[in-house]
């Protein structure tokens, strides 16, 4: 050592001061580094509990209202084919990337005739519908041609299930001669002597579509959002309120009409506008509240429909208005699950889009192509499936304009369409979780974070497993997936994120643990 070297005690500061200023900070720096490394390497373990099956998943879907009627009439057939592929295809391209989201149920809006009335319908042009039934009582099977084209395109691409729903009875049968309620009150807009006529119209229409288009309808919803207070404010779009007694009466007539036509179509009750209307009285009165007990308790003698041969023991409703605050979203779905269990019925979520109270993403106005809306909706899907035990899940409109109600943004004048991250986010579920899959419980040592990781798992009928992991956070998250039976599985990962091209993109093979990208949805498919 050079004898002229300056030792610490020759510095103008003391040894203790030098140590506190220079050595201790370095010690804490390295301690922080090692702690961070240890934290990063310690991935959260999510365990699929193979002995804890939950509900059977029937399908994922969307509806043809209202855009498919006009899109189906475009001259640009290539664009129609592209849209149909995005919605219905289960094929992959040469790189193994899905061409579409593989919807497994398609909701067809059976029209009431407001389009034929034109301006006198008091309904916005874009939400009017044609009717197969004509004034003279005959049927015109050339009506609703755009919608029928997409029925065929869906079937050609292998969609296995079809559902018909109505917002109004045909205008010939309504009390005001319109397909909208025009503020007339909270009772059904249907003449008292036309219940059987309305039922025959529905059955005849489904029979005709089967004969002319080769489409069999598995399900029929005679009413739509009958408890929605908007339904008796009108006019804006087709719609009618109804009391539970009126709905039960219509269900009985519809049951007879379907049987007479030799159809095994099932009648769904009752497409409530808000799941809170299933549990109690919400923004309405007793005649439209407590839908579950009203329709499925034998003690409800005037409204019980559980004894009808073509009414399955399930309730269909819409998840609007119940997605914020986030803790409440979970709570109300758990309440719904317990109420369904009490009466021995299942739950289907048949319609949802972004509404004005979805403040976290700025409400429904203005289309959003990004993961902001996609992640928000994925969180709703996760809650509906894992807390409400929904057996079926459907988005509202397949295609729409400058509002957050369409999976695909369409430009009518240009006759073209643009996909969105929302479309592919639904595909993280619909493309890989096929009809008949069973959801299994997933456990973790950490409490689920609706702003972080949300994980659910499913086993398809072919025995292959599927796991969907949502990373809602702005940071990558370490992730480890295992099974309670300790068996090893190899997974192909498909990711949707804001990264260009990551629309169900295959991003590698998973065997142990990995890091989930920030603001992404990853689907793990067993190889």
Map each language-model feature to its residues.
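Carbohydrate-binding surface patches
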Residues: 446-489, 519
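Hydrophobic h-region of N-terminal signal peptides that target proteins for export
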Residues: 32-42
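Aromatic/acidic polysaccharide-binding cleft in carbohydrate-active enzymes
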Residues: 346-431, 440-446
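Solvent-exposed beta-hairpin/edge-strand motifs
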Residues: 484-501
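Noncatalytic carbohydrate-binding groove/subsite architecture in carbohydrate-active enzymes
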Residues: 207, 237-374
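N-terminal catalytic cores of secreted or lumenal carbohydrate-active enzymes
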Residues: 48-217, 230, 237-244, 252, ...
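Structural recognition of the beta-strand scaffold that forms the well-ordered cores
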Residues: 58-64, 104-110, 161-165, 218-222, ...
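C-terminal beta-strand-rich structural cap/linker in extracellular carbohydrate-active enzymes
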Residues: 506-527
């Amino acid at each position: 050592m050079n004898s002229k070297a300056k030792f610490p005690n020759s510095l103008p500061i003391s040894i203790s001061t030098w140590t506190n200023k220079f050595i201790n900070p370095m010690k804490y720096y390295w301690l922080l580094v090692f702690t961070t490394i240890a934290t990063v390497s310690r991935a959260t373990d999510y365990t699929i509990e193979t002995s804890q099956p939950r509900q059977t998943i029937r399908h994922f879907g969307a509806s043809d209202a209202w855009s498919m009627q006009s899109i189906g009439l475009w001259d640009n057939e290539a664009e129609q084919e592209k849209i149909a592929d995005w919605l219905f295809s289960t094929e992959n391209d040469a790189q193994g990337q899905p061409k579409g989201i593989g919807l497994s149920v398609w909701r067809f809006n059976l029209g009431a005739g407001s389009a034929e009335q034109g301006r006198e319908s008091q309904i916005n042009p874009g939400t009017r519908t044609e009717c197969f039934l004509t004034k003279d009582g005959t049927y015109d099977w050339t009506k609703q041609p755009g919608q029928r084209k997409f029925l065929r395109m869906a079937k050609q691409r292998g969609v296995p299930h079809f559902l018909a729903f109505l917002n109004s009875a045909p205008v010939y049968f309504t009390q005001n001669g319109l397909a909208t309620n025009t503020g007339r009150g909270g009772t059904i807009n249907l003449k008292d002597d036309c219940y059987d006529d309305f039922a025959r119209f529905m059955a005849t229409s489904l029979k005709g579509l089967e004969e002319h288009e080769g489409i069999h309808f598995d399900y029929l919803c005679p009413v739509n959002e009958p408890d929605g207070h908007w339904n008796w404010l009108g006019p804006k779009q087709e719609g009618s309120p109804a009391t539970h007694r009126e709905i039960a009466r219509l269900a009985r007539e519809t049951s007879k009409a379907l049987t007479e036509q030799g159809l095994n179509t099932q009648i769904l009750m009752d497409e409530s506008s808000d799941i809170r209307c299933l549990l109690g009285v919400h923004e309405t009165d007793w005649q439209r509240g407590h839908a579950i007990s009203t329709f499925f308790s034998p003690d409800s003698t005037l409204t019980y429909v559980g004894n009808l041969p073509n009414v399955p023991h399930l309730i269909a409703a819409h998840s609007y208005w119940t997605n914020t605050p986030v803790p409440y979203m979970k709570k109300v779905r758990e309440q719904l699950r317990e109420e369904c269990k009490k009466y021995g019925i299942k739950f289907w979520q048949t319609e949802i889009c972004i509404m004005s109270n979805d403040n976290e993403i700025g409400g429904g106005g203005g289309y959003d192509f990004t993961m902001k809306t996609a992640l928000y909706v994925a969180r709703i899907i996760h809650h509906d499936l894992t807390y409400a035990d929904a057996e079926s899940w459907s988005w509202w409109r397949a295609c729409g304009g400058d509002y957050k109600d369409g999976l695909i943004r369409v430009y009518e004048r240009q006759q073209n369409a643009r996909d969105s991250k929302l479309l592919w986010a639904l595909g993280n579920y619909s493309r890989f979780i096929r009809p008949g899959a069973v959801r299994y419980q997933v456990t973790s040592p950490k409490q689920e974070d609706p702003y972080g990781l949300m994980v659910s798992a499913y086993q398809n009928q072919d025995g292959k497993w599927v796991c969907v992991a949502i990373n809602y956070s702005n940071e990558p998250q370490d992730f480890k997936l295992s099974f309670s039976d300790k068996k090893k599985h190899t997974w192909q990962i498909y990711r949707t994120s804001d990264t260009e091209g990551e629309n169900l993109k295959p991003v590698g093979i998973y065997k142990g643990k990995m890091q989930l990208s920030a603001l992404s949805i990853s689907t793990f498919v067993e190889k």
